[in-house]
């Protein structure tokens, strides 16, 4: 899709821990397909994921580059399952802080409700519990999803509501 023909260029930052790699990849495919649908309406969505940043040494921490991209995005989407990685939490805080200052990015948190192998649970589950509590204390709405199809459906419903306003 040629984004030069689009009248609206929407930047979406996707944050999650590596445990949700499959969901991240499927979300990227979903955004690509949505672009094909939305292009006729003059909309192009650019998905920003950490995998697309170069690994070259940065003048600051590479995480600072991600945080800058978060602050310059229109929509921030974070996914959680059994842990909340420190960088994902940092990105959430940057997005939420920027939203409070400027009204952007719109912040979405999606929590996966799925089967967990008890043997795979580590102390990192506490990071998830602490983060979930933090989100609740902020009064931020979190969305539960069962699988990738459910996530895509819920996010598409949100896109249909917000894209005309962005």
Map each language-model feature to its residues.
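Generic recognition of short, well-ordered alpha-helical segments
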Residues: 25-26, 60-61, 90, 123-126
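Conserved beta-strand termini and adjacent loop/short-helix elements that scaffold enzyme active sites
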Residues: 48-52, 110, 145
